[in-house]
Amino acid sequence: MLNFSDRLIESIKKKNSVLIAGIDTSIENVPDYFIKRFYDREKSEIDNLKTILFEYNRRIIDAVEENVVGVKFQAAFFEQYSYHGFEVLHKLCEYAKNKKLVVIFDGKRNDISSSAKGYSNAYLGETPVFGRKIRFFEFDAITTNPYLGQDGIKPFVEDCERFKKGLFVLVKTSNPSSADFQDLTVEDKYLFEVVAEKVYEWGKNCVGKEGYSDIGAVVGATQKEAAKRIREILPNSFLLVPGIGVQGGKVEDLKYFVDSNNMGIIVNSSRDIIYAYKNYVHSDFEKSSYLASKSIKESINAAIS
């Protein structure tokens, strides 16, 4: 089996795209006509919720698959519906994998080593059950929080090596208050630089045949100045770049995120794709999402070519 980074590069070349569709759907943003179409008064509200969430997101995936290399499922938008949401997440993960898309779990997980191992078992590896190992999810990669240090990251890295999976560590995020901690100085370096250096160390043993590490970084699209420095520290890592569009990141700034080969990034867009119907004159959300993903893909390609 190919390393995660090699599989990602294959998909990028095949699709001529570095775009990731973020699946961050809340039921209140699903069009009313779609809810009415699937709402069954003979079923419980929970059953209707699960059906509508799955069917809406499934159609989004179908609509954008031509223009994206993968999908990123934001855990919070499924956790808010308790275990019912995770039932939907499990089905959508399988659905996207069957579409040959790269599938990322955006859970920003971490904890002390034993707990981190549980998270890694769930989303990257295998979980021991009655003397055998069971794989519950088929994600290709996961986002993690580095705050607990190496022992909290180690289980994820080990599973990346063993199962050819990927890891994206939070380094410099797109939210306005990211500077509260990430821009603090440690021995004349910003804290985000120190974290990036750790990411480089953690990824040394997870390098694919194309020369890229399977351990990458999350760097917000609003952080172009930081991105320049992070790219110097991580010359052969993929950067997962959220925050273009609604969050204020500019497509034209992506040139500061790519490596010397104009590679090394995947760019997430969520609301501009999954709720694109709000910005188009017609009400066909599938067509709107297709057109939005195509437009974003082309804009990104123009910016980094």
UniProtKB/Swiss-Prot annotation:
Q: Which Gene3D superfamilies match?
A: Aldolase class I (3.20.20.70)
Catalytic activity of the protein: orotidine 5'-phosphate + H(+) = UMP + CO2
> What's one Pfam family here?
OMPdecase
Transmembrane residues, as ranges? none
Which pathway is this protein engaged in?
Pyrimidine metabolism; UMP biosynthesis via de novo pathway; UMP from orotate: step 2/2
Q: What is its EC number?
A: 4.1.1.23
Keyword annotations from UniProtKB, A to Z: Decarboxylase, Lyase, Pyrimidine biosynthesis
Q: Which residues form the active site?
A: 108
Superkingdom of origin: Bacteria
Show the SUPFAM superfamilies listed in the entry.
Ribulose-phoshate binding barrel (SSF51366)
Q: Which GO terms describe its molecular function?
A: orotidine-5'-phosphate decarboxylase activity
Q: What is one process in the GO biological process aspect for this record?
A: 'de novo' UMP biosynthetic process
User: Per the similarity annotation, which family is this?
Assistant: Belongs to the OMP decarboxylase family. Type 2 subfamily.
HAMAP family, per this entry? OMPdecase_type2
Q: What is this protein called?
A: Orotidine 5'-phosphate decarboxylase
Question: To which species is this protein native?
Answer: Caldicellulosiruptor saccharolyticus (strain ATCC 43494 / DSM 8903 / Tp8T 6331)
Q: Which gene encodes it?
A: pyrF
